UniProtKB/Swiss-Prot annotation:
Function: Transcription factor which plays a key role in limb development. Positively regulates FGF8 expression in the apical ectodermal ridge (AER) and contributes to limb outgrowth in embryos.
Compartment(s): Nucleus
Name of the gene: sp8b
Name used for this protein in its record: Transcription factor Sp8
Organism: Danio rerio (Zebrafish)
SUPFAM superfamilies from the UniProt entry: beta-beta-alpha zinc fingers
Length: 437
C-alpha cells in the first residue's frame, strides 16, 4: 500500500533540471527518491536540499544530480564527513569525491519506500521479515553496520534457550541463564561494554541450584548457630545441664549425653540433676541406690554446701550465685527483678495492697504467709501468759503487718480491720476468766 501511494505521488513530479542554482526565486517541488548512480549508498536516506548559493536561496524538495540521492540535505561548505556519522551511521550517504557541488549532510530519514524489492536493494543485509532490525542495531554506535542481519531471519527479539544474552561488538557474550529453561532475549545493546563487570554472575545469580561460592559464607555463618551443648537422648530436660551449669563449675562439666551409664538413670518419675550428690549416685551405679532414695541435692559451689530436697529449689538457689534474676516486675516505673517467681508475686502485692492471708480467729489479713503463721501463734499461747500475753501478741501481730507493708499503699489499714485487734483480747480475757471461775 505504501509503495502504491509513493508511485502515485512520484508520477506528476517536475524535472529537477527546472530549478537553477543561481535563481533568486524559490522553486518548490516534490521529487521521488532515486538511487544514486555515481555514488554507492549502502544505507542511504532520502533527504531534501536546502541550498544557499550567492544571493539566491533555493528551498526545494529536489535532488542534486551530481551528488546522487539526497533529500532534506544541508550544504556544509567544505566538510565532506558528517559529524553524525558515528552516532547515526544508518543515515550516512556516500558522496562522490569528484563532485563539483558542496557535500550534503543527512539530517532526516525518509519513510518513503517504493516497493519491497527496493528495500532489499537499498538494504541488502536486512531481512524482509524484520524491516526495523538494521535501524535498531545501527542506532547504537558500538555495533558496526556490517553486522546487521548477518544471522539471516533472526531478529533481536528472538527467543532462545537462556534468559539474557547481551552481545558486545567484539563478539563476547554475557549469558546469565536459568537452569530451569525459559526465555533468552538477545539484546544487541551497549550493555556489551559491561561484559567484564557482570561476567561473574554467569550461572550463579539467577540460577535455581545452589552455587558453591555463594553459599560458602552462609554455611560458615550458620555454623555459629549450632547448639553448643548436645541434648539428652530423652525428652526430659535437665534443670542444671544448660548454659548455667557450665558457667557455674568454672571448668568442663561431665557430659552425661555421651556417657553410656547415663541411660541407667533415665527412668520415669525422676528429674535429671547434675548436683554432686546425683553425680556420685550415678558413678556408684547400683550401689548408689541409697543416695537416690534420700533425694538430696547439694550445691556444688565450694564453701556453700546447702542441700535441697527438690531440684527446682536448688536451681533457684544457684541463681543467687550467678546473679540471674529472670523475673521482672512489670509495674509502672518499677522494673525490679527477682530470682524466684514467688518473690515476684509477693512484691506485686506491695503495689496492689492485697492481703490474701487471713487469720481464722480474728480475721486479720496479711500479705505474707509467714506473717500469718506468726500471728496465729499469738492465739495459741499458753494460759499462764494471761491477758498481757494476749495483748502483747496482738501488738506483735500488728507491728509485723505494718512493718512489711509499703507506706502509702492503698487500703493498707481499713477501719474494720483496725477494730479487730481490740475485740480479740476482750473475748480472750472473758473466755479465760469464765474458765478460771
Amino acid at each position: 500500500m505504501l509503495a502504491a501511494t509513493c508511485n502515485k505521488i512520484g508520477s506528476p513530479s517536475p524535472s529537477p533540471s527546472s530549478i537553477s542554482d543561481n535563481s533568486s526565486s524559490f522553486g518548490k517541488g516534490f521529487h521521488p527518491w532515486k538511487r544514486a548512480t555515481a555514488s554507492s549508498c549502502s544505507l542511504g536516506s532520502s533527504l531534501s536540499s536546502f541550498t544557499r548559493n550567492g544571493g539566491g536561496l533555493s528551498d526545494s524538495f529536489g535532488t542534486n544530480t551530481s551528488t546522487g540521492s539526497s533529500a532534506f540535505s544541508l550544504t556544509s561548505g567544505t566538510s565532506s564527513n558528517s559529524h553524525f556519522g558515528n552516532d547515526y551511521s544508518v543515515f550516512q550517504t556516500s558522496v562522490s569525491n569528484n563532485s563539483q557541488e558542496p557535500s550534503h549532510q543527512p539530517m532526516f530519514i525518509s519513510k518513503v519506500h517504493t516497493s519491497v524489492d527496493s528495500l532489499q536493494s537499498i538494504y541488502p543485509r536486512m531481512s524482509v521479515a524484520h524491516p526495523y532490525e538494521s535501524w535498531f542495531k545501527s542506532s547504537h554506535p558500538g555495533i558496526p553496520t556490517g553486522d546487521v542481519g548477518t544471522t539471516g531471519a533472526s531478529a533481536w527479539w528472538d527467543v532462545g534457550a537462556g534468559w539474557i544474552d547481551v552481545q558486545n561488538p567484539n563478539g563476547a557474550a554475557l549469558q546469565t541463564s536459568l537452569h530451569s529453561g525459559g526465555l533468552q532475549t538477545s539484546l544487541h545493546s551497549p550493555l556489551g561494554g559491561y561484559n567484564s563487570d557482570y561476567s561473574s554472575l554467569s550461572h550463579s545469580a539467577f540460577s535455581t541450584s545452589a552455587s558453591p561460592h555463594l553459599l560458602t559464607t552462609g554455611q560458615h555463618l550458620m555454623d555459629g548457630f549450632k547448639p553448643v551443648l548436645s541434648s539428652y537422648p530423652d525428652s526430659s530436660p535437665s534443670p542444671l545441664g544448660g548454659a548455667g551449669g557450665s558457667m557455674l563449675t568454672g571448668g568442663p562439666t561431665a557430659s552425661l549425653a555421651g556417657s553410656p551409664r547415663s541411660s541407667a538413670r533415665r527412668y520415669s518419675g525422676r528429674a535429671t540433676c547434675d548436683c554432686p550428690n546425683c553425680q556420685e549416685a550415678e558413678r556408684l551405679g547400683p550401689a548408689g541406690a541409697s543416695l537416690r532414695r534420700k533425694g538430696l541435692h547439694s550445691c556444688h559451689i565450694p564453701g556453700c554446701g546447702k542441700v535441697y530436697g527438690k531440684t527446682s529449689h536448688l536451681k533457684a538457689h544457684l541463681r543467687w550465685h550467678t546473679g540471674e534474676r529472670p523475673f521482672v516486675c512489670n509495674w509502672l516505673f518499677c522494673g525490679k527483678r527477682f530470682t524466684r517467681s514467688d518473690e515476684l508475686q509477693r512484691h506485686l502485692r506491695t503495689h496492689t495492697g492485697e492481703k490474701r492471708f487471713a487469720c481464722p480467729v480474728c480475721n486479720k489479713r496479711f500479705m505474707r504467709s509467714d506473717h500469718l503463721s506468726k500471728h496465729v501463734k499469738t492465739h495459741s499461747a499458753g494460759g499462764s501468759s494471761g491477758s498481757g500475753s494476749g495483748a502483747s501478741g496482738g501488738k506483735r501481730g500488728s507491728d509485723t503487718d505494718s512493718e512489711h507493708s509499703v507506706p502509702g499503699s492503698p487500703s493498707c489499714h481499713s477501719p474494720d480491720l483496725l477494730q479487730a485487734p481490740e475485740s480479740v483480747p476482750t473475748t480472750g480475757m472473758n473466755g479465760r476468766a469464765s474458765s478460771l471461775d
